[in-house]
Amino acid sequence: MSDEIVTNKSVTYVNNTTPVTITSSELDLRSCYQDDEVVIEVHAAALNPIDFITHQLCNSYIFGKYPKTYSRDYSGVIIKAGKDVDNRWKVGDKVNGMYSHIYGERGTLTHYLILNPAKDIPITHMVEVPKDENDPYDDFVYAAAWPLTFGTAFSTLYDFKKDWTSDSKVLVIGASTSVSYAFVHIAKNYFNIGTVVGICSKNSIERNKKLGYDYLVPYDEGSIVENVKKLKQIVLENDKFDMIFDSVGNHDFFPVIDQFLKPKAKNSFYVTIAGNNKANYKNISWRDFVSLSSILKAINPFKKYNWRFGHPYPPNNFIEVGNEMIKKGTYKPPIDSVYEFDQYKEAIDRLMSNRAKGKVVVKMK
């Protein structure tokens, strides 16, 4: 067999009745890409909850019976480039990014990823992560760990509200998630937001203090609403929040939202990336995401506050902001655990456990 003909292994599923598995296909590196595409030999890919959500919601009658590949975040090396590819992307370049798809035959939990760098954005050249001598992870692991979560956090802060100042105040529900980790670093180090309050378990408070939160409130010691209310009255001089950001799925504040969120006229926002309830990744249904209450919050013209569903928005250039923050040392992608490719099931189980503190990454090389 020619060295240009390789076996491409990918982690795939067909629908919500089939488990994830490794599938193999033959790939001819001489002809598998178009003139405007590159072939990336993937070194690492990160898992995200969207992988489980799309898998469990995949009805074969609606979404077809072809193999669908896991994951969106990636890092790797360009090994082939079409003749029409912009010359900023060359063979040998180390790159990372987010390959956006819902039910794509191409995903990033694969050994070879083919994409169009002009269309399949964001993609960027990897930057070196500042590390100490005891750091166990290489740059490929770090590079795969941040595009989707960082992009979600940055887009939430950048796209909805434009007038952040040192007087601004934000409440983060779910301070321990990877998205919230990025959120607080971006809020404090890029937008210079004055006050960021986080809600987390009492056991996570010490960890999260080091991330930059100004104040932390436990959700497992009394009422969340009452605990935040006391903080607002005693410490924040009863000033309300410019944004409430929910990264876990919560509805506790809705009945009393006017006590915590500034008026709609002041350009305040309630932004969620998880819906109104904490998801059980092992048993997900469409009702968890397309509930009547969510629809009403999104389209109801009579509600007194702005409600939005957050997601990464590549055109806002978040990938370059992330690179700059990584180089400056103001953001370091958090890693929970790293697994080899054939340990993909253990990696999935780890993320589904809801116990991961940082990204779960799978290495291909």
From Swiss-Prot:
Subcellular location, record wording: Lipid droplet; Mitochondrion
Gene Ontology cellular-component terms listed: lipid droplet; mitochondrion
A Pfam family: ADH_zinc_N_2
Domain of life: Eukaryota
Primary location class: other
Key words of the record: Lipid droplet, Mitochondrion
Entry-linked Gene3D superfamilies: Medium-chain alcohol dehydrogenases, catalytic domain, NAD(P)-binding Rossmann-like Domain
PANTHER family named in the record: ALCOHOL DEHYDROGENASE RELATED, RETICULON-4-INTERACTING PROTEIN 1, MITOCHONDRIAL
Similarity-based family: Belongs to the YIM1 family.
Protein name, entry field: Protein YIM1
Organism: Saccharomyces cerevisiae (strain RM11-1a) (Baker's yeast)
Gene: YIM1
